[in-house]
Protein backbone atom coordinates (compact mmCIF):
# COMPACT_ATOMS: atom_id res chain seq x y z
CA UNK A 1 0.00 0.00 0.00
CA UNK A 2 1.37 3.40 -1.03
CA UNK A 3 0.38 6.14 1.40
CA UNK A 4 -0.82 9.41 -0.11
CA UNK A 5 -2.80 10.35 2.98
CA UNK A 6 0.05 12.04 4.81
CA UNK A 7 -2.10 15.05 5.71
CA UNK A 8 -3.84 12.74 8.17
CA UNK A 9 -0.66 11.08 9.48
CA UNK A 10 2.70 10.81 7.82
CA UNK A 11 3.79 7.25 7.09
CA UNK A 12 6.35 5.84 6.79
CA UNK A 13 8.32 7.60 9.52
CA UNK A 14 12.05 8.28 9.38
CA UNK A 15 14.10 5.33 10.61
CA UNK A 16 15.56 7.56 13.33
CA UNK A 17 12.07 8.08 14.78
CA UNK A 18 11.45 4.32 14.97
CA UNK A 19 14.83 3.79 16.64
CA UNK A 20 14.16 6.55 19.16
CA UNK A 21 10.78 5.08 20.10
CA UNK A 22 12.31 1.62 20.55
CA UNK A 23 15.12 3.04 22.68
CA UNK A 24 12.64 5.03 24.78
CA UNK A 25 10.58 1.94 25.56
CA UNK A 26 13.72 0.02 26.52
CA UNK A 27 15.71 2.66 28.40
CA UNK A 28 13.59 5.67 29.41
CA UNK A 29 10.62 4.17 31.24
CA UNK A 30 10.54 6.54 34.20
CA UNK A 31 7.79 9.05 34.92
CA UNK A 32 9.27 12.49 34.08
CA UNK A 33 9.05 15.00 36.91
CA UNK A 34 7.55 12.45 39.29
CA UNK A 35 10.34 11.61 41.68
CA UNK A 36 13.94 12.43 42.48
CA UNK A 37 15.33 9.05 41.43
CA UNK A 38 17.50 8.34 38.41
CA UNK A 39 14.99 6.81 36.00
CA UNK A 40 12.56 9.69 36.52
CA UNK A 41 15.38 12.18 36.03
CA UNK A 42 16.58 10.51 32.83
CA UNK A 43 13.08 10.59 31.34
CA UNK A 44 12.64 14.22 32.39
CA UNK A 45 15.92 15.16 30.72
CA UNK A 46 14.84 13.55 27.45
CA UNK A 47 11.51 15.40 27.56
CA UNK A 48 13.31 18.68 28.24
CA UNK A 49 15.60 18.12 25.27
CA UNK A 50 12.62 17.71 22.94
CA UNK A 51 10.88 20.70 24.48
CA UNK A 52 13.99 22.79 23.88
CA UNK A 53 14.21 21.56 20.29
CA UNK A 54 10.59 22.55 19.63
CA UNK A 55 11.13 25.93 21.28
CA UNK A 56 14.09 26.60 19.01
CA UNK A 57 12.21 25.55 15.87
CA UNK A 58 9.15 27.69 16.58
CA UNK A 59 10.82 30.67 18.24
CA UNK A 60 9.40 30.19 21.73
CA UNK A 61 10.68 30.25 25.28
CA UNK A 62 11.16 26.67 26.39
CA UNK A 63 8.67 27.00 29.26
CA UNK A 64 5.99 28.08 26.78
CA UNK A 65 6.04 24.78 24.88
CA UNK A 66 3.43 22.33 26.18
CA UNK A 67 3.03 18.75 24.96
CA UNK A 68 -0.46 17.56 24.04
CA UNK A 69 -2.01 14.42 22.60
CA UNK A 70 -2.53 16.01 19.18
CA UNK A 71 -3.43 19.31 17.52
CA UNK A 72 -7.11 18.95 18.43
CA UNK A 73 -6.26 18.87 22.14
CA UNK A 74 -3.96 21.87 21.73
CA UNK A 75 -6.68 23.85 19.94
CA UNK A 76 -9.28 22.95 22.57
CA UNK A 77 -6.92 24.04 25.33
CA UNK A 78 -6.16 27.35 23.64
CA UNK A 79 -9.70 28.20 22.46
CA UNK A 80 -11.47 27.19 25.67
CA UNK A 81 -8.69 28.60 27.81
CA UNK A 82 -9.13 32.04 26.24
CA UNK A 83 -12.92 31.98 25.75
CA UNK A 84 -14.03 30.12 28.88
CA UNK A 85 -15.59 33.19 30.47
CA UNK A 86 -17.49 34.50 27.47
CA UNK A 87 -17.01 37.06 24.73
CA UNK A 88 -16.81 36.87 20.96
CA UNK A 89 -14.51 34.83 18.70
CA UNK A 90 -13.95 34.90 14.93
CA UNK A 91 -13.05 31.87 12.81
CA UNK A 92 -12.69 31.37 9.05
CA UNK A 93 -14.95 29.45 6.69
CA UNK A 94 -12.15 26.94 6.02
CA UNK A 95 -11.85 25.57 9.54
CA UNK A 96 -11.38 21.97 10.62
CA UNK A 97 -13.82 20.56 13.17
CA UNK A 98 -11.00 20.88 15.71
CA UNK A 99 -11.75 24.62 15.63
CA UNK A 100 -15.44 24.81 14.72
CA UNK A 101 -16.67 22.23 17.23
CA UNK A 102 -15.00 23.71 20.34
CA UNK A 103 -16.32 27.13 19.31
CA UNK A 104 -19.82 25.72 18.81
CA UNK A 105 -19.64 23.95 22.17
CA UNK A 106 -18.68 27.23 23.86
CA UNK A 107 -21.65 28.93 22.21
CA UNK A 108 -24.01 26.18 23.29
CA UNK A 109 -22.78 25.77 26.88
CA UNK A 110 -21.38 29.18 27.81
CA UNK A 111 -23.02 31.67 25.48
CA UNK A 112 -19.82 32.55 23.66
CA UNK A 113 -20.71 34.30 20.41
CA UNK A 114 -18.86 33.52 17.19
CA UNK A 115 -18.63 34.85 13.65
CA UNK A 116 -17.35 33.14 10.51
CA UNK A 117 -15.18 35.22 8.17
CA UNK A 118 -15.24 34.51 4.46
CA UNK A 119 -11.87 33.68 2.89
CA UNK A 120 -11.28 35.40 -0.45
CA UNK A 121 -8.73 34.82 -3.21
CA UNK A 122 -7.49 38.32 -2.33
CA UNK A 123 -5.59 38.29 0.98
CA UNK A 124 -6.37 41.91 1.79
CA UNK A 125 -10.06 41.26 1.24
CA UNK A 126 -9.85 38.25 3.55
CA UNK A 127 -8.27 40.37 6.28
CA UNK A 128 -10.92 43.01 5.67
CA UNK A 129 -13.62 40.38 6.15
CA UNK A 130 -12.14 39.49 9.54
CA UNK A 131 -11.74 43.16 10.48
CA UNK A 132 -15.40 43.87 9.71
CA UNK A 133 -16.48 41.21 12.23
CA UNK A 134 -14.48 42.55 15.20
CA UNK A 135 -16.70 43.62 18.12
CA UNK A 136 -15.97 45.33 21.42
CA UNK A 137 -15.66 42.02 23.23
CA UNK A 138 -13.86 40.02 20.52
CA UNK A 139 -11.25 38.07 22.45
CA UNK A 140 -9.71 35.83 19.79
CA UNK A 141 -9.31 35.09 16.11
CA UNK A 142 -8.77 31.40 15.43
CA UNK A 143 -7.87 30.19 11.97
CA UNK A 144 -6.11 27.44 10.13
CA UNK A 145 -2.78 28.36 8.57
CA UNK A 146 -3.48 25.96 5.70
CA UNK A 147 -6.70 24.15 4.81
CA UNK A 148 -6.61 20.41 5.34
CA UNK A 149 -8.96 20.02 2.35
CA UNK A 150 -7.35 21.98 -0.50
CA UNK A 151 -4.12 23.12 1.16
CA UNK A 152 -5.05 26.80 0.73
CA UNK A 153 -2.77 29.01 2.84
CA UNK A 154 -4.58 31.80 4.66
CA UNK A 155 -2.94 35.24 5.19
CA UNK A 156 -1.84 34.35 8.71
CA UNK A 157 0.82 37.04 9.02
CA UNK A 158 -1.63 39.79 8.12
CA UNK A 159 -4.20 38.33 10.50
CA UNK A 160 -1.56 38.34 13.22
CA UNK A 161 -0.98 42.04 12.58
CA UNK A 162 -4.73 42.68 12.73
CA UNK A 163 -4.95 40.93 16.09
CA UNK A 164 -2.04 42.92 17.48
CA UNK A 165 -3.68 46.20 16.40
CA UNK A 166 -6.83 45.31 18.35
CA UNK A 167 -5.20 43.46 21.29
CA UNK A 168 -6.94 40.25 20.23
CA UNK A 169 -5.48 36.80 20.85
CA UNK A 170 -4.43 35.04 17.64
CA UNK A 171 -4.64 31.24 17.72
CA UNK A 172 -3.22 29.40 14.72
CA UNK A 173 -4.00 25.84 13.64
CA UNK A 174 -0.67 24.76 12.19
CA UNK A 175 -1.50 21.07 11.71
CA UNK A 176 -1.12 21.15 7.92
CA UNK A 177 1.65 23.76 7.78
CA UNK A 178 4.21 23.03 10.48
CA UNK A 179 7.02 21.05 8.87
CA UNK A 180 6.41 22.31 5.32
CA UNK A 181 6.10 26.03 6.09
CA UNK A 182 8.71 27.61 8.34
CA UNK A 183 6.27 28.94 10.94
CA UNK A 184 7.40 30.68 14.13
CA UNK A 185 5.70 32.79 16.78
CA UNK A 186 7.27 35.82 15.10
CA UNK A 187 4.64 35.39 12.36
CA UNK A 188 2.15 36.91 14.80
CA UNK A 189 0.75 33.92 16.67
CA UNK A 190 -0.05 34.15 20.35
CA UNK A 191 -0.72 30.42 20.32
CA UNK A 192 0.45 28.03 17.63
CA UNK A 193 -1.12 24.57 17.80
CA UNK A 194 0.15 21.64 15.81
CA UNK A 195 0.28 17.87 15.51
CA UNK A 196 3.46 15.91 16.00
CA UNK A 197 2.37 13.03 13.79
CA UNK A 198 1.90 14.83 10.46
CA UNK A 199 4.66 16.85 8.76
CA UNK A 200 6.83 16.82 11.88
CA UNK A 201 7.14 13.03 11.41
CA UNK A 202 6.61 12.09 15.03
CA UNK A 203 4.47 9.22 16.36
CA UNK A 204 0.71 9.44 16.77
CA UNK A 205 -0.43 10.75 20.14
CA UNK A 206 1.85 13.79 20.02
CA UNK A 207 1.06 17.47 19.63
CA UNK A 208 2.30 20.90 20.65
CA UNK A 209 0.73 24.01 22.17
CA UNK A 210 3.22 26.84 21.75
CA UNK A 211 2.70 30.27 23.30
CA UNK A 212 4.41 33.65 23.28
CA UNK A 213 3.30 34.20 26.88
CA UNK A 214 1.18 37.26 26.11
CA UNK A 215 -2.14 35.64 27.10
CA UNK A 216 -2.74 33.41 30.12
CA UNK A 217 -4.92 30.36 29.62
CA UNK A 218 -7.58 29.10 31.97
CA UNK A 219 -7.14 25.36 32.31
CA UNK A 220 -9.60 22.80 30.99
CA UNK A 221 -7.75 19.87 32.60
CA UNK A 222 -6.33 19.84 36.12
CA UNK A 223 -4.43 17.25 38.08
CA UNK A 224 -0.99 16.07 39.07
CA UNK A 225 1.85 18.13 37.63
CA UNK A 226 4.79 17.24 39.83
CA UNK A 227 4.77 20.85 41.09
CA UNK A 228 2.99 22.57 44.05
CA UNK A 229 1.43 19.22 44.92
CA UNK A 230 0.26 20.41 48.37
CA UNK A 231 -2.07 22.99 46.82
CA UNK A 232 -5.60 22.31 45.59
CA UNK A 233 -5.29 25.02 42.97
CA UNK A 234 -3.62 24.10 39.68
CA UNK A 235 -0.07 25.39 39.45
CA UNK A 236 0.55 28.60 37.53
CA UNK A 237 4.01 27.45 36.50
CA UNK A 238 4.46 26.77 32.81
CA UNK A 239 4.49 24.32 31.12
CA UNK A 240 3.32 22.18 34.05
CA UNK A 241 0.07 24.18 34.24
CA UNK A 242 -1.00 22.70 30.90
CA UNK A 243 0.46 19.20 31.34
CA UNK A 244 -1.58 17.43 34.00
CA UNK A 245 -0.93 13.73 34.36
CA UNK A 246 1.85 11.54 33.03
CA UNK A 247 3.31 12.66 29.73
CA UNK A 248 3.65 10.33 26.74
CA UNK A 249 7.41 10.14 27.09
CA UNK A 250 7.90 7.52 24.38
CA UNK A 251 6.00 9.52 21.78
CA UNK A 252 7.67 12.76 22.80
CA UNK A 253 11.12 11.25 22.36
CA UNK A 254 10.05 10.00 18.93
CA UNK A 255 8.77 13.48 18.10
CA UNK A 256 12.15 14.88 19.03
CA UNK A 257 13.75 12.81 16.28
CA UNK A 258 11.03 13.93 13.88
CA UNK A 259 11.90 17.56 14.65
CA UNK A 260 15.57 16.79 14.04
CA UNK A 261 14.69 15.18 10.72
CA UNK A 262 12.67 18.20 9.55
CA UNK A 263 15.34 20.67 10.64
CA UNK A 264 17.99 18.68 8.80
CA UNK A 265 15.93 18.42 5.59
CA UNK A 266 14.47 21.95 6.06
CA UNK A 267 10.76 22.73 5.63
CA UNK A 268 11.57 24.58 2.41
CA UNK A 269 13.18 21.53 0.79
CA UNK A 270 10.38 19.23 1.96
CA UNK A 271 7.78 21.67 0.62
CA UNK A 272 9.56 21.83 -2.74
CA UNK A 273 9.75 18.05 -3.14
CA UNK A 274 6.13 17.48 -2.20
CA UNK A 275 4.82 20.38 -4.29
CA UNK A 276 6.61 19.08 -7.38
CA UNK A 277 4.83 15.76 -6.88
CA UNK A 278 1.51 17.57 -6.47
CA UNK A 279 2.06 19.51 -9.70
CA UNK A 280 3.02 16.31 -11.51
CA UNK A 281 -0.08 14.55 -10.20
CA UNK A 282 -2.43 17.44 -11.01
CA UNK A 283 -1.10 17.73 -14.56
CA UNK A 284 -1.55 14.01 -15.15
CA UNK A 285 -5.08 13.62 -13.81
CA UNK A 286 -6.23 16.86 -15.49
CA UNK A 287 -5.92 14.97 -18.78
CA UNK A 288 -8.90 12.89 -17.66
CA UNK A 289 -11.92 15.03 -18.58
CA UNK A 290 -13.93 13.57 -15.70
CA UNK A 291 -11.55 14.98 -13.09
CA UNK A 292 -12.20 18.24 -11.28
CA UNK A 293 -9.38 19.75 -9.20
CA UNK A 294 -10.33 22.21 -6.47
CA UNK A 295 -8.48 25.51 -6.00
CA UNK A 296 -5.49 24.54 -8.16
CA UNK A 297 -4.20 28.12 -8.50
CA UNK A 298 -4.22 29.26 -4.87
CA UNK A 299 -1.10 29.46 -2.71
CA UNK A 300 -1.18 26.22 -0.80
CA UNK A 301 0.68 23.49 1.03
CA UNK A 302 1.30 20.24 -0.91
CA UNK A 303 -2.23 18.88 -1.29
CA UNK A 304 -4.41 18.13 -4.33
CA UNK A 305 -8.18 17.91 -3.79
CA UNK A 306 -10.15 16.37 -6.64
CA UNK A 307 -13.21 14.40 -7.70
CA UNK A 308 -13.84 11.96 -10.54
CA UNK A 309 -17.08 12.91 -12.26
CA UNK A 310 -20.11 12.38 -10.05
CA UNK A 311 -18.52 9.49 -8.15
CA UNK A 312 -18.72 9.98 -4.39
CA UNK A 313 -15.27 10.73 -3.04
CA UNK A 314 -15.41 7.94 -0.46
CA UNK A 315 -16.24 5.39 -3.16
CA UNK A 316 -13.33 6.68 -5.25
CA UNK A 317 -10.97 6.44 -2.28
CA UNK A 318 -12.17 2.90 -1.56
CA UNK A 319 -11.56 1.85 -5.17
CA UNK A 320 -8.07 3.36 -5.07
CA UNK A 321 -7.39 1.51 -1.83
CA UNK A 322 -8.22 -1.74 -3.61
CA UNK A 323 -5.61 -0.77 -6.20
CA UNK A 324 -2.98 -0.24 -3.49
CA UNK A 325 -3.18 3.52 -2.86
CA UNK A 326 -4.23 5.26 0.37
CA UNK A 327 -6.00 8.59 -0.20
CA UNK A 328 -8.61 10.33 1.93
CA UNK A 329 -12.18 10.68 0.69
CA UNK A 330 -15.17 12.35 2.33
CA UNK A 331 -15.17 15.58 4.30
CA UNK A 332 -11.74 15.35 5.99
CA UNK A 333 -13.44 16.49 9.25
CA UNK A 334 -13.83 19.98 7.78
CA UNK A 335 -17.51 20.57 7.03
CA UNK A 336 -17.11 24.37 7.00
CA UNK A 337 -14.51 24.17 4.24
CA UNK A 338 -16.68 21.83 2.19
CA UNK A 339 -19.69 24.10 2.59
CA UNK A 340 -17.51 26.92 1.25
CA UNK A 341 -16.32 24.79 -1.68
CA UNK A 342 -19.79 23.44 -2.45
CA UNK A 343 -18.66 19.85 -1.89
CA UNK A 344 -20.62 19.01 1.26
CA UNK A 345 -22.50 16.17 -0.46
CA UNK A 346 -19.72 14.64 -2.57
CA UNK A 347 -16.69 15.48 -0.48
CA UNK A 348 -13.32 15.35 -2.21
CA UNK A 349 -10.50 12.88 -2.67
CA UNK A 350 -7.35 14.28 -1.09
CA UNK A 351 -3.85 13.48 -2.36
CA UNK A 352 -1.10 14.40 0.10
CA UNK A 353 2.46 13.12 -0.46
CA UNK A 354 5.34 13.08 2.00
CA UNK A 355 9.07 13.58 1.85
CA UNK A 356 9.37 9.85 1.09
CA UNK A 357 6.94 9.84 -1.86
CA UNK A 358 8.35 9.19 -5.34
CA UNK A 359 7.52 10.21 -8.91
CA UNK A 360 7.01 6.60 -9.99
CA UNK A 361 4.39 6.15 -7.27
CA UNK A 362 2.55 9.26 -8.47
CA UNK A 363 2.62 7.99 -12.05
CA UNK A 364 1.16 4.67 -10.94
CA UNK A 365 -1.63 6.42 -9.03
CA UNK A 366 -2.54 8.59 -12.02
CA UNK A 367 -2.69 5.51 -14.26
CA UNK A 368 -4.97 3.81 -11.74
CA UNK A 369 -7.34 6.80 -11.84
CA UNK A 370 -7.48 6.66 -15.64
CA UNK A 371 -8.77 3.08 -15.47
CA UNK A 372 -11.48 3.71 -12.85
CA UNK A 373 -15.08 3.31 -13.97
CA UNK A 374 -17.84 5.39 -12.39
Name what the model sees in each region:
Residues 1-374:
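Pyridoxal 5′-phosphate
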